[in-house]
Amino acid sequence: MSLYEEIDYKKLERLEVKHSWIVEPIYKASTYVKSMPFYDWIENLNDIQDFRDAGCQLYYHSDTFPKVMGLMLALTPLEETLMMPFYAKHAYGEADHSKMLLDWMIKHNLVKDYQEVRDVIITKETNACVNYAYQMAIEQDREKWLVGLNSGIERCSNDFFKAIAPKMHKLGAGDEYFDVHVEADEHHSIIGLDYIEQYEADSTRGKILIAKALEGIELWASMIHSWIGISTYPKFNLKGEIIKDIKC
């Protein structure tokens, strides 16, 4: 039985309309990310052994995020107690995913054991993306957390797994780890907006939240490209439009 509730697409549509002030920039920016070189790399992936380096970085991300979610839960102030089931369910749903990934990597001889993954040097871009979530957990701003992690990062994650899951099946290496994230991340993305206020896009608070969501998307894009040896740092304006893509 799935941990995640069946997606209510009518509710999703209502939230997209109600919060178009932030949904539109998120969608526009995340769509741009899908046009970047990393997705060409996935499309051209013909041997799962070529996924090893990316897989080891992904393991760190997959292993760390539930801990960040646990921190968000643990630091929840009394006045935010009603959010605890939401945070707890998200953390619990992600808790065993890194083990699933490790088992898959060992099964397909990408690594021989856990220590081999531990010995990998994590890219600064991967650390930056994870630390973005840690910073929000410490800050305990519910709206920033929901637009940044649940709506921005999770949407990009959903796009990633929608691309990589069928590719792995095509290569004869499909696995529940990849498949479950298509369901899980789609469940989390945008639905969290049910717990934030409605703002005008040009209001001070609206601009702060849009900027926080786009910051996460920028960090995500830099992170996944670092997994394949590309240094790129996209920058979006508050409409979600690309204004700069620095490649080093």
Language model segments and positions:
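Non-heme di-metal
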Residues: S2-C248
